[in-house]
Amino acid sequence: MRKLVIGAARQTDTLGFNILINQERLKNLLIELIKIDSLSRREYDIAMRLKREMEELGATVWIDDAGEKVGGNVGNLIANFSGNAPSARPLLLSAHMDTVVPGERIVPLLDGDILRTDGKTVLGGDDKSGVAIICEVLRVVKDNRLPCGDIDVVFTICEEAGLVGAKCLDAGRLRARTGLVLDSDSVGFLFTKAPAANRMEFRVHGLEAHAGVCPEKGISAIKVAADGIAQMKLGRIDHETTANIGVIEGGMAVNIVPNSVILKAEARSHSQEKLDQQTQHMRRCLEEAAARHELRADGKVFRARVEAKIERDYDRMNVSDQAPIVQLVQAAAENLNIEIKTQATGGGCDANVFNQKGLEVANLSTGMRDIHTVNEWLDLKDLYLSAQMVLETVRLNGAHPPVA
């Protein structure tokens, strides 16, 4: 594959303030990407479109084996761009290619500066807005020969399926040790802190019986689960901690006392101690509920029981306000007369995983709103502002390399 080194900066563009993104081009690319179906584990079509885009811009591109590992039809797309400022820090720019359901045959509708759908699907601005911004920034850098260091672009798969694309990424193959994920809905904030999360699956075992003839000979697993859930602290636990039971599966028929039910849950916290406490609290509530449900019949004792599977979903993100990437973004915002604040979020994203892998990555907003719903919309003015800020961050990094 052809490898293009982005040319030296023009002297007239040293300050970079007169270099603007092409709003029309960015808007059109975003709409094009939105129309490409890309549910988790089915990102092949958009990956091929982005592969062509990256190669046209001169990157060395490859696709890793994450798709094989997670049962998808394509892996993470990685593109390496060679810069023209060898002393500048290599930067990572990343966004995810997949969308949540319902996300097929999306019809984007433009009303002034607001992009939304026909109400039958999500928009897919999460996270195709981030993908489009990265493409536009790289094109502006190339076309204007702006100063920049090496840039590693990572378009991940399966972010919406538990960040598994990022988890499968070999970060050792990247040159960049710091950078940005573009995957947030709150404009004016750079997210530098995010919680760790535990994922839980509880299988509650009861005893089946005929619900009409002899219900007293059964132990309802659903009733046991309900008893345990009723004792749990869920939702907003405190300013650092949340918990949720999101899936309940069980039962075979209305005339059978159910002998099994599965609960799928999560807990999140910015505090490891609180995360451990909340996780054990949820487990204990179910185990204590099971202990209260005992049946003696035919000379035997039957007791409800709980099987628990608990695993770390992702570690917390905690990037210092003094980190180089934070300082760069804040300097870029100041140059553009934009107010931006560092902020903690309750959500997890690929940045959590990248930081866990030893990188220093923050999460920047893109203008998306009401994500994961059919009411999702995006403000193009915020999209353009975010793109301009990323462009200025890249330019500053190349124009003012770190002092050795």
Listing of model-derived features with the role each one plays in the protein:
Residues D98-D113, F191-R203, Q330-A331, A362:
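Acidic-glycine-rich active-site phosphate/pyrophosphate-binding loop
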Residues A221-A404:
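Metal-dependent amide/peptide-bond hydrolase catalytic core
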Residues T14-Y44, R312, I371-T373:
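N-terminal capping segment at the start of a domain
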Residues A47, G72-N73, N80, P86-F155, ...:
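Active-site metal-coordination/substrate-binding segment of hydrolases
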Residues L110-V122, H205-A209, L336, M368-H372:
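Glycine/charged-rich beta-loop-alpha catalytic/anionic-binding loops adjacent to active sites
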Residues L39-P86:
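A non-catalytic alpha/beta surface segment that caps or lines the substrate-entry region
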Residues G67-K69, M97-T99, V154-G162, S184-S186, ...:
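Acidic, glycine-rich active-site loops and adjacent beta-strand->loop/helix elements
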Residues G119-P195, I237, A243, V254-N255, ...:
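Acidic/histidine-rich catalytic neighborhood of metal-dependent amide-processing enzymes
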